[in-house]
């Protein structure tokens, strides 16, 4: 038979896992300068509707927007965020974009 403490620890871990999954949603944030919607403001993905993420906007805050299927990063030289496309690191001033002809992601100039 399990001890009462072991069962409580397992229950706590299950609840913590469920909460963590609710606060992060799949997908990537679009480029900050392409998010013109400044409201509603948010702090975490769990505050947004089912298909939206909490992402930086051009107003300097974060708001709920439709998630992007690809990682666009911010693509600017000197940023701390590297941008990768299909496992390849994009250069400075490049972002990851889906090419409709080849049906693949590729690095393009911003």
From Swiss-Prot:
Tissue expression notes: Expressed by the venom gland.
Localization of this protein: Secreted
Subcellular location, principal: secreted
SUPFAM superfamilies, alphabetized: Elafin-like
Lipid biosynthesis among keywords: no
Annotated disulfide bonds: 29-55, 38-59, 42-54, 48-64
Chain ranges of the WAP domain: 22-68
Keyword Disulfide bond applies: yes
GO cellular component: extracellular region
Single GO molecular function: serine-type endopeptidase inhibitor activity
PROSITE patterns in the cross-refs: WAP
Any matching Pfam family: WAP
InterPro entries the record matches: Elafin-like_sf (IPR036645), WAP_dom (IPR008197)
Segment forming the signal sequence: 1-20
GO biological process, one term: defense response to bacterium
Keywords from the UniProt entry: Antibiotic, Antimicrobial, Disulfide bond, Fungicide, Protease inhibitor, Secreted, Serine protease inhibitor, Signal
Role this protein plays: Antimicrobial peptides with activity against Gram-positive and Gram-negative bacteria as well as fungi. Recognizes carbohydrates in the microbial cell walls, and induces structural damage to them. Also inhibits microbial serine proteases subtilisin A and proteinase K, as well as human and porcine elastases. Carbohydrates that are recognized are LPS, mannan, peptidoglycan, and N-acetl-D-glucosamine.
Note: Negative results: does not inhibit plasmin and thrombin. Does not show any hemolytic activity on mouse erythorcytes.
Similarity-based family: Belongs to the venom waprin family. Cys-rich waprin subfamily.
Listed name of the protein: Waprin-Thr1
Species whose genome carries this gene: Apis mellifera
């Amino acid at each position: 038979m399990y001890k009462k403490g072991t069962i409580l620890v397992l229950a706590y871990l299950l609840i913590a896992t469920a909460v963590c999954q609710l606060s992060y949603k799949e997908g990537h944030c679009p480029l900050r300068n392409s998010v013109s919607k400044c409201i509603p403001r948010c702090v975490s993905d769990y505050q947004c509707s089912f298909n939206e993420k909490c992402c930086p906007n051009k107003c300097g805050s974060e708001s709920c927007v439709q998630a992007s299927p690809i990682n666009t990063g911010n693509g600017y030289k000197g940023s701390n965020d590297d941008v990768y496309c299909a496992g390849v690191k994009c250069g400075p001033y490049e972002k990851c974009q889906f090419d409709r002809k080849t049906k693949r992601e590729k690095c393009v100039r911003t």
